[in-house]
Each structure stands twice: as C-alpha cells, then as structure tokens.
Curated annotation (Swiss-Prot):
Modified residues (Cysteine sulfenic acid (-SOH)): C615
Organism encoding this protein: Bradyrhizobium sp. (strain ORS 278)
Active site per the UniProt annotation: R338, D629
EC numbers for this chain: 2.3.3.9
Summary of the function given for this chain in its UniProt record: Involved in the glycolate utilization. Catalyzes the condensation and subsequent hydrolysis of acetyl-coenzyme A (acetyl-CoA) and glyoxylate to form malate and CoA.
Subunit description: Monomer.
Protein name according to UniProt: Malate synthase G
Record: residues binding Mg(2+): E430, D458
UniProt keyword annotation of DNA damage present: no
Length: 724
C-alpha cells in the first residue's frame, strides 16, 4: 500500500479519501487543516500517551514484586494499602467538588432508562439500536420468556391464548404505572379526551380519569376517538395504541392494539470492545457508519418474508397536548460514541517515526469532525439538541489518564473550531486504579463528564491481572458474590452522588449478557435502578423495552435522594480485598472450570479472527446464548492464565480442553456457511489466537486481549487476501 504523506503523517489512502470526500465536506473544515491538526496533537500528546502506558507497567511490576515478597504471609490490608499509596497507585482523595457539565441533553441529565451498546461495524444493528427509543411491550412479552412459554402455544401465526396473557400482563403494568382513579385499564371500553383530561369509560358504563391527571401527556388522532394516548411516569412515556381494526385491537374492549414504551433512552455506538477493526479499511467502515448516523443518511437493506426492506433513522414523534398545543418527542435514542482507549494503536495512520499512532487520538479527531454534521443540522433528525458531542472513553487507569483525555478533547475542539467543552466524556469505571481513585477521575473531567459506568467483566479482568502474583483466584462464577464486587458497584454510585452527577451525567450499570433470558432479567435487573443508577446496559432493543419497566417501578431520583441521605455505603478496604482462594478444588471442578473458560474463549475468538465479528451471541458450554465481547474474553483468558501460573492446572490440561472444546464449538457453528472448523487440525489462526490468549495471558499488558486479537486477525486477513 502506498501511503499519502501529509504533515509528516503517512495515511492509508482509504482513510485519506474518506476524510477528503465524505467526512469533511459541509463541515467547514479543510481536510489538509484537519491532518495538520492531527499531526500537531500527535506531536504534543503522543509521547504523553506512551509515558502513561509505561507507568501502568511500572506499577504492575511493583505490585507483582510486593506480592512475591509477601508470599506465604497472611494478607495485611493495612500494609497493602500503604504500599499502594507509596507507589502512587492509590492517590489522596480530593475535596468534594461538584461537577459543572453544561449543555447536556435530557437523556443524560434528566431521563432515567435503558442504554444499548452496539457495534459500529454493523449498520443495521446500529440503526436498530438508534431506533430502539420506542419499543412494543406486546411484542417484548409475546416473543420472549418474560411470559413462560406453554407448549400448546406453538405453531405459526398469532396464538390468542398467549396473546391474552400478554395483554393481561401489559394492562397490569399500566395499572401500576398510570392507575385510574377507579377501576382497572382492563375494564376500559373507550378512551377519549374531554376538556384536556383523559377520560376512560368502564364496562360498568361509568367514566373515570387517571388517578394523577398530570400523567396524561398527549394524544394522536381526534379527542373523541384518539389513536394514541400518551402517558408519562418517572420521566418516561408510554403510548397506548388504539386500533379496532387490528388483529389484537378488534378483540380488546377499548380497542387497544399495543403499548409502545419509551425504551432505549441512550445508545453507545461502539468503536471499541464489540468491534474487530484492525486496519484502515475496518476503521473507515466504522467511521462511515458513524457519519451516516450523524448526517441522517445511514440506511440498511435486509430480507424479510421474501421482500427487501430498508431501515433508516426514525423521525421524531408528535402529539397534541392536553391544552391543545403540540408536543414533539425524540424518536431515537441519544447516541454516544465509544472511542478506543489510550492503549490501542492503529496502522491507519503512521507517525513521523513510521510507528502506528494512538488509536484514541485518531478516534477523537474523526469523531469530532463527523459530529459537526449533527451540530450543523445536516440531518433531518437531530442527535444532540444542546450542541454536545458525547464520547465514552474506556480503559483509563486513574486521573492522569482522564486528564490526558480532557486535554485531547480540548485540542480537537480548538482544531475544529468548536466551543470549549463541546466534547463530553463518559468515564468507564472498568479498571481497578480508576475505581479506587474515582473521585479524582471525575474531578479531572468536571466540566465534561456525562457518564460513569461500572463494567463487571473488564473490571474483574483487571482485578485478576493486577493481583496475578497474589495467588490463585476463586472460580469465575463465584466472583460476583465477593465483597469487592458489591463495594465496587456501590462505590461508583456513592462517588457519582457525592460529586453531583445527577442533572449533569449518567450513573450507569453493566450489561445483561443473556438476551434469551428475559424472565431472569426482569427478576434481577431491577437491582440497577434500585441501586441509584440512572441507566444500565441491555443487549437488544427487546431487552431495552423490558428493562424500561424497571424505571417505571423505581423512581431513581427519589432513590438517589435516599442514598444521599444515608451517606456512602462502600468501603475502600472491601474494594482492595483480593479474591484469592485457599480451596483445594476437586478434579471435576477444575476440569469444569477449564472447559467453561476454554469453550467461551474459542466460541468468541473463532468469529473474531475468521469473520471479523467483534460482538455476537455465542452459545456457552450449556448452549445458552450469551453476548460476548472483548470484556468477557479478558476475564476468561486471565482466569486461566492465573490458574496456570499458580499450578492449579497444567498446560497439558488446558491444551486438552482447548482441543475438546474446539470440537464442541465447531458443532455449535455447523449451520454457519462462513464458519471454518478448528478441529481436527487445530492449526488455524483462530485456534492459535485462543492459545496465545491463555498461555501468554500473564504477560499481556493489564491482561488486555486486543494486541493478540489484532495481530492474529491481520494474519487471517492477509491469508484470505493471498488465497484470493
């Protein structure tokens, strides 16, 4: 490939052309000036980026040495804490300073609800997520195990017996979220609007109204026979759809054919953990899809029922208000964009030294450029209505790394002529050093922060790697019951409340990873809003619709007030308690643990390496589909690396399991025409990558999987090109 030279940079032609011909036009930014700005930022911040990465390694070496020096001794939390302070890992907690982030959209500062995460490599998935702001409750109940499936309800077409259960459950939700003054929504035979109030005629012939008249937010159609009733509860909206000609509405006493819930309030468009973007072509695909979302042109064709359908961004929704005015509601999820972390490098651009440049610097510059299309109103639909660009920054270790991000964003703003603090930052609290210094991290970004979020899987991966020399870790499935996990989750909310995030920023919780287990999600994920979180991650638009029910059940703002009055709950000592085990596991337990980890690693890695799929529903060892990305890979590979290092398992045991599980994964993927089996040769690039992740896991910086995955994916792509 012949690269294009610009201001000392050597740029891949596909990226150069994208910036020149697609991204820059209509922004007012000259492409040459853009590259001059990127080059200047790299000159000033590139070395600082590398110094911070070296400091990570220095701290890890010192922590390893401390554990080795104290091997065989009882763990002394006091001595350990003092040591972490001495080496600069644990910093003094700063005085409380409330955040000052301004110009945030309501989806960030006011509305509590679900958050989707979607790979930017897949246009249709990205559009589905952006459009998941509104979702059918009837469909979500009918199509999932949220209502248990009865074998008698099988067959093609609409099953009325199951439909009746769905309607009953949905009406029960409505009775709880927007109750009538008398009676139940089940008893309503007609809704109408009279003198600006919602009137509900009951089977008895009497009319009633809402218990709280203020919950009636608007309607569509005529006042006498509205086609949609809009209700509000805890900041979220519900549409009651009325259509007596519909297959469901014709049998409903009130003609109700569906309930549409405000669901995915926000969505993270991911350039990081859920994508496999290893070269300039991949990066341009990610950037091009981002551009299409920012300027409103993105569309995707797909086949359904023998027809080709086109998906595009939904329009806003319009209603008549109770007073006769017009109400417009956002028709799409507010979009945040997750850039790569400081530790990633890309060959899409080479620096003056011929080396790959920090990928996060390129991401920030390009994201800012692309978002100008939204800020300038080039799309028929707006993302931010307050003039902000929302960027989630992952895998930062401590406040100095947050400070680098803040400086980077300031430089990009200056380069692009954007007002100061236009580029907002979401801080992923997924690394141990960020957790223990979270207050200082927040304060470094006090005028930009719009998001803090816990991520159990990555955070556990860093927990294992940081304390690799402390001893063998407990079994993976026992990790969630450990004291450090609860303390970590509570600490995040505590710090968010202390620093005044409500009204300025989201406080988020992690992913529900089992998209087919919606009954379990309904039972368990209510814990996230109950913990004071304003948002939490879900794996699909359907899951977003169902998780929205929790925000109708829990008034998060009231819960946050309760927590604030109660004071901080988490203790630093619990967070620093290392989850090592003294157990002498039975051979069957060890084999089960190895097999579980190996199967999960192979099931994810084989698609990443061979097909470039960075996030997908991967069957686990029991054939339960789980959403996998690099975070799940990190914990599994680090856990095996830890057990190998401490002699709990041998290399031969792990290799035997990898080969047996490769056969299992091959069978699970037998229906995929693009799949390349790993057995019986076990010499493919994907299998080798899985082996590298385990057997080299202890020496990978912070236990990250990206370096091995990227190298092996590039190898696989080169092999494909050679064959072609």
């Amino acid at each position: 490939m012949t690269r294009i030279d610009a201001h000392g940079l050597k740029i891949a032609p596909v990226l150069f052309d994208f910036i020149t011909k697609e991204a820059a036009p209509k922004t007012g930014i000259d492409p040459d000036a853009f590259w001059a700005g990127v080059a200047a930022i790299l000159r000033d911040l590139g070395s600082k980026n590398r110094e911070l990465l070296k400091f990570r390694d220095t701290l890890q070496d010192k922590i390893d040495a401390w554990h080795l020096a104290n091997k065989g001794k009882a763990f002394d939390l006091g001595a350990y804490t003092a040591f972490l302070k001495e080496i600069g890992y644990l910093l003094p907690e700063p005085a409380t300073q409330k955040v000052e982030t301004a110009n945030v959209d309501d989806e960030i500062g006011k509305i509590c609800g679900p958050q989707l995460v979607v790979p930017l490599t897949n246009a249709r998935y990205a559009l589905n997520a952006a459009n998941a702001r509104w979702g059918s409750l009837y469909d979500a109940f009918y199509g999932t195990d949220a209502i248990p499936h009865d074998p008698s309800e099988g067959g093609k077409g609409y099953n009325k017996a199951r439909g009746d259960k769905v309607i009953a459950k949905a009406k029960a939700f409505l009775d709880a979220a927007a109750p009538l003054a008398t009676g139940s929504h089940t008893d309503v035979t007609a809704y109408s609007v009279i003198a600006g109030q919602l009137s509900a005629k009951l089977k008895s012939g009497n009319a009633t109204a809402l218990k709280n008249a203020g919950q009636f937010a608007g309607y569509q159609g005529s006042a006498e026979a509205p086609s949609v009733i809009l209700l509000a509860n805890n900041g979220l909206h519900v549409e009651v759809v009325i259509d007596r000609s519909h297959v469901i509405g014709k049998d409903d006493p009130a003609g109700v054919s569906d309930m549409i819930l405000e669901a995915a309030v926000s969505t993270i468009l991911d350039m990081e953990d859920s994508v496999a973007a290893v070269d300039a072509e991949d990066k341009v695909l990610v950037y091009r899809n981002t551009l299409g979302l920012m300027n409103g042109t993105l569309s995707a064709d797909f086949e359904k029922g023998g027809k080709t359908l086109t998906r595009a961004l939904n329009s806003d929704r319009s209603y008549t208000t109770p007073s006769g005015g017009t109400l417009a509601l956002h028709g799409r999820s507010l979009l945040l964009i997750r850039n790569c972390g400081h530790h990633m490098f890309t060959d899409a651009v080479l620096g003056a030294d011929g080396e790959e440049i920090p990928e996060g610097i390129l991401d920030a510059a390009v994201t800012g450029l692309l978002a100008i299309h939204d800020l300038k109103g080039h799309s028929k639909v707006k993302n931010s209505r307050t003039g902000s660009i929302y960027i989630v920054k992952p895998k930062m270790h401590g406040p100095d790394e947050v400070a680098l991000t803040v400086e980077l964003f300031a430089r990009v703003e200056k380069m692009l002529g954007l007002p100061e603090n236009t580029m907002k930052v979401g801080i992923m609290d997924e690394e141990r050093r960020t957790t223990v210094n979270l207050k200082a991290c927040i304060q470094q970004a006090s005028k930009r922060i719009v998001f803090i979020n816990t991520g159990f899987l990555d955070r556990t991966g860093d927990e294992i790697h940081t304390s690799m020399e402390a001893g063998p870790m407990i079994r993976k499935n026992e990790m969630k019951a450990q004291p450090w996990i609860k303390a970590y989750e509570d600490w995040n909310v505590d710090m968010g409340l202390i620093d005044g995030l409500p009204g300025h920023a989201q406080i988020g919780k992690g992913m529900w990873a089992a998209p087919d287990k919606m009954a379990d999600m309904l039972a368990q994920k209510i814990g996230h809003p109950s913990a004071g979180a304003t948002t939490a991650w879900v794996p699909s638009p359907t899951a977003a619709t169902l998780h929205a029910l929790h925000y109708h059940q829990v008034n998060v703002k009231a819960r946050q007030d309760e927590l604030t009055k109660g004071g901080p709950r988490a203790k630093l000592g619990d967070i620093l308690t290392i989850p090592v085990s003294n157990s002498n596991w039975a051979p069957d337990d060890v084999r089960q643990e190895i097999d579980n980890n190996c199967q999960g690693i192979l099931g994810y890695v084989v698609r990443w390496i061979d097909q470039g799929v960075g996030c997908s529903k991967v069957p686990d060892i029991h054939d339960v589909g789980l959403m996998e990305d690099r975070a799940t890979l990190r914990i599994s590979s680090q856990h095996l690396a830890n057990w190998l290092h401490h002699g709990v398992v041998s290399k031969d045991q792990v290799m035997d399991s990898l080969k047996r599980m490769a056969v299992v994964v091959d069978k699970q993927n037998a229906g995929d025409p693009l799949y390349q089996p790993m057995a019986p040769s076990f010499d493919g690039v994907a299998f080798k990558a899985a082996c590298d992740l385990v057997f080299e896991g202890r020496t990978q910086p912070n236990g990250y999987t990206e370096y091995i995955l990227t190298a092996r994916r590039r190898e696989a792509k080169a092999s494909e090109t050679a064959k072609a």
